[in-house]
Amino acid sequence: MGRNTRGGRKMIKPNITYVDMDGVIADFFGGLAKEFNVNHWKEIPTQQEVIDKITGTDFFSRLGIFPTTIRFLHMIERYTKGHWSIISTPLKGDEENSAKHKNKWLDEVFGYAFDNDFNKKRFYSDKKWMWATDTGEISSGIPNLLIDD
């Protein structure tokens, strides 16, 4: 079998790889547990309590990373030869503020993982699944890779 085949089927290389932030490279649920002073995020009674507490705050810029985040980002950079972007869902009703603080977090993590000049495009959408092919707006049939939790 050729290099670009698997099980006799031709493998199609993704056009672009999109990496989600919350729950993939940022410890969103650990941040929630800390914010609510509980041992596990499932101890928080309602989703509305979460939204009410973090709306209008810098919550997203204060999230921690996973022990594997930096190694994972380096792997993505190497595997895609730099052809990847961030896709993240902004907090409903607080889109502008949450995106601002997600950008701050990403700037800090990218600066730490790579260098201060390193940057990646960031897209904010509540329909991340649409980005699994093309740009989420047009369709050429070329698949993308969406890494999400």
Where are these regions (language model features)?
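Short, Lys/Arg-enriched N-terminal segments with co-localized hydrophobic residues
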Residues: M1-K10
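Active-site neighborhood of HAD-like aspartate-dependent phosphohydrolases
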Residues: M11-T57
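A general structural motif
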Residues: I12-P14, K81-H83, G141-P143
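Short, solvent-exposed loop/turn segments at secondary-structure junctions
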Residues: G23-A26, G31-L32, P90-D94, G136-E137
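Substrate-recognition element of Asp-dependent hydrolases with the DxDx(T/V) motif
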Residues: G64, T69-K102, L106
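Acidic, glycine-rich loop-and-strand cores that form catalytic or ligand-binding grooves
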Residues: H101-F114, N119
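Conserved Lys-Pro-Asp/Glu-containing loop-to-beta segment of HAD-superfamily phosphomonoesterases
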Residues: F118-D149
